[in-house]
Amino acid sequence: MPQFQTWEEFSRAAEKLYLADPMKVRVVLKYRHVDGNLCIKVTDDLVCLVYRTDQAQDVKKIEKFHSQLMRLMVAKESRNVTMETE
């Protein structure tokens, strides 16, 4: 389970993993109040990518990344629905 040290590396790898097979990828966010750590995990059951942080500024990056993935998911779904109706 590779744990990334920089956000840029993690976000690129996670997006590639999602684009490879969108139906199998899951995203898990976990916050531990005791440690003050936020962990984001992206997995497709074969590859598991992990990024941990205790910095408040990284929360905004994670939020932006999460919304970017949601946009990709919606774009794929709307394309599939249009193709099915034709």
Swiss-Prot record:
The keyword Cytoplasm applies. The keyword Secreted does not apply. One of its GO terms (biological process) is negative regulation of translational elongation. It comes from the Eukaryota. Coiled coil: none annotated. InterPro entries: Signal_recog_particle_SRP9/14 (IPR009018), SRP9 (IPR008832), SRP9-like (IPR039914), SRP9_dom (IPR039432). GO terms for molecular function: 7S RNA binding. Keywords: Cytoplasm, Ribonucleoprotein, RNA-binding, Signal recognition particle. Its main location: cytoplasm. GO terms for cellular component: signal recognition particle, endoplasmic reticulum targeting. Belongs to the SRP9 family. This is Signal recognition particle 9 kDa protein. It comes from Mus musculus (Mouse). The lineage of its organism: Eukaryota, Metazoa, Chordata, Craniata, Vertebrata.
